[in-house]
Each structure stands twice: as C-alpha cells, then as structure tokens.
Amino acid sequence: MAELKVTQIKSTIGTKQNQRNSLRTLGLKGIRQTVVREDNAQNRGLINVVRHLVTVEEV
C-alpha cells in the first residue's frame, strides 16, 4: 500500500482546536517535522483539515 510523507510547514498559532488536534493525530508536533503515514481514507481526511499547514508527498 502507498504511503504519504507529511511535513508541517506552518505554525499552529491562531488555528482552530480541531486543526491542532488533527496535526497531533497525524503525529506532527512542530514546524519542519515529517512523518510517514499510510495512505487511507482516515489519514486523507486528517490531511484535508490541515492542508494549508502541511505539504504531502507520495513515498
């Protein structure tokens, strides 16, 4: 199965609580931190909520 490389590029200052929760669920705690997650509907939904704060690449 494909994987997604998700990197946080912007700060969570001034964002809504649900966006901060989505980043934490993805495993991102700071700017320039990168995680590799499975490409499934759940992770795609979390990424969609914070699409303006992260970059996504297929691995």
Curated annotation (Swiss-Prot):
Q: Which GO terms fall under molecular function for this chain's record?
A: structural constituent of ribosome
Q: Name one GO cellular component term.
A: cytosolic large ribosomal subunit
Entry's Gene Ontology BP terms: translation
Q: Does the keyword Transmembrane helix apply?
A: no
Pfam families associated with the record: Ribosomal_L30 (PF00327)
The record's annotation in Gene3D superfamilies points to: Ribosomal protein L30, ferredoxin-like fold domain
Keyword entries, A-Z: Ribonucleoprotein, Ribosomal protein
PANTHER family of this UniProt entry? LARGE RIBOSOMAL SUBUNIT PROTEIN UL30M (PTHR15892:SF2), MITOCHONDRIAL RIBOSOMAL PROTEIN L30 (PTHR15892)
Q: What does the record note on quaternary structure? A: Part of the 50S ribosomal subunit.
Q: State the protein's name.
A: Large ribosomal subunit protein uL30
Organism classification: Bacteria, Bacillati, Actinomycetota, Actinomycetes, Mycobacteriales
